[in-house]
Amino acid sequence: MGAMAQNPPNLRPDLAPRLVIDSPRREGQPTIGMVSLGCPKALVDSERILTRLRAEGYAISPDYAGADAVIVNTCGFLDSAKAESLEAIGEALRENGRVIVTGCLGAEPDYITGAHPKVLAVTGPHQYEQVLDAVHGAVPPAPDPFVDLLPATGVRLTPRHFSYLKISEGCNHSCRFCIIPDMRGRLVSRPERAVLREAEKLVEAGVRELLVISQDTSAYGTDWKGPVRFPILPLARELGQLGAWVRLHYVYPYPHVRELIPLMAEGLILPYLDIPFQHAHPEVLKRMARPAAAARTLDEIAAWRRDCPDITLRSTFIVGYPGETEEEFQTLLDWLDEAQLDRVGCFQYENVAGARSNALPDHVAPELKQERWERFMQKAQAISEAKLAARIGQRLEVIVDEVDGEGATCRTKADAPEIDGNLFIDEGFEALSPGDLLTVEVEEAGEYDLWGRAVLV
């Protein structure tokens, strides 16, 4: 196995890195490999680390054999993600032997070194300086300012036409099933000017879609205690002026989210909200330590759709949470029927080391969790299929992601990369390139995907 894995554990509704960086290498140039696991926030951390290393004269290798050392950026959100991270570390040790570990699982160094005592160093999430120090110790830098050129946007692990834009780090919530605040700390928002400057550089470099991410996007700037109550609102408006698609992810359902909807109706940002509702029964939400207001949530959804009829709503849910009864699960199914969400992800609850939910009574049996997951996804799939069938005959603006000999893979404004569906063009695609925007008439629909033909407008 010579090539380094770049696929994250398939555990969360997140976006996976799809490209491996392969930078030209001059003679004698130190070279680093990177394995990036987990969510988009971790991917941005990987990009920042690689950018710093490129600036110091390191080349980036796409395989183990060409690397002087390998960085593994780990995921530690769920126990199954931890196991997959340990597997990736083990593979890097076997294939290369010189491994530096960082990321969320790095917050548990004893857990890592207990399994892999030969790793060179372990650092926690977004500890960039410690990672660089570890790299310097393993492979000293050898910069050449006349040869080592760095793109204005830094090193990116996404296709050229879309990019993640991380606006904050950490989270102030205390959900019982989650340990992210323990791993990444409390909310720290990036200055608005820094976010906008990064976004401007990305758009100038050809990025057509900005995917705004954080642990809690709608809480952006609330840690400043400044005169603006909800800084996400002016930030979203400013981003919407740049001429790229702007897609909001990880939006916690605060009441002020309704103030984002007019920006969507105006066309400044995409009419798309990624909101993790997690459940609908008030008692389950209370056990999760999340807002127990499912009825009000339905009212909010109705208001969003009234003010922006084209809005697409994506959410994620947990089934089999400790203590979940059949009645509580049925409430979730009934809520989904009424909410008619466009895009849905669902996960079976599992214990996470350090999570307070582990101590809750009445854990649900694995076979019952699986059965409930299947019932939930069957309903969600039927809703998706009906909603997509209603798109047949409509003309939609799409962005091209990939083009090969068989056709073009595109996305509508209602679809985020990797986690949502695609729109496929099978004819008349030869002149298209990734990043192109065009109008397509929908001709066929499936459970999650669409097919159509390009039209001239």
UniProtKB/Swiss-Prot annotation:
PROSITE patterns: MTTASE_N, RADICAL_SAM, TRAM. Binds 2 [4Fe-4S] clusters. One cluster is coordinated with 3 cysteines and an exchangeable S-adenosyl-L-methionine. GO terms for molecular function: 4 iron, 4 sulfur cluster binding; aspartic acid methylthiotransferase activity; metal ion binding; protein methylthiotransferase activity. Keywords: 4Fe-4S, Cytoplasm, Iron, Iron-sulfur, Metal-binding, S-adenosyl-L-methionine, Transferase. Disulfide bonds: none annotated. GO terms for biological process: tRNA modification. Coiled coil: none annotated. Belongs to the methylthiotransferase family. RimO subfamily. Residues 157-386 form the Radical SAM core domain. Catalyzes the methylthiolation of an aspartic acid residue of ribosomal protein uS12. It catalyses: L-aspartate(89)-[ribosomal protein uS12]-hydrogen + (sulfur carrier)-SH + AH2 + 2 S-adenosyl-L-methionine = 3-methylsulfanyl-L-aspartate(89)-[ribosomal protein uS12]-hydrogen + (sulfur carrier)-H + 5'-deoxyadenosine + L-methionine + A + S-adenosyl-L-homocysteine + 2 H(+). This is Ribosomal protein uS12 methylthiotransferase RimO. [4Fe-4S] cluster 2 binds at residues 171, 175, 178. Its cofactor is [4Fe-4S] cluster. GO terms for cellular component: cytosol. Residues 389-456 form the TRAM domain. Its main location: cytoplasm. Its EC number is 2.8.4.4. It is found in: Cytoplasm. [4Fe-4S] cluster 1 binds at residues 39, 75, 104. Residues 30-140 form the MTTase N-terminal domain. The gene is rimO. InterPro entries: Elp3/MiaA/NifB-like_rSAM, Methylthiotransferase, Methylthiotransferase_N, Methylthiotransferase_N_sf, NA-bd_OB-fold, Ribosomal_uS12_MeSTrfase_RimO, rSAM, rSAM_horseshoe.
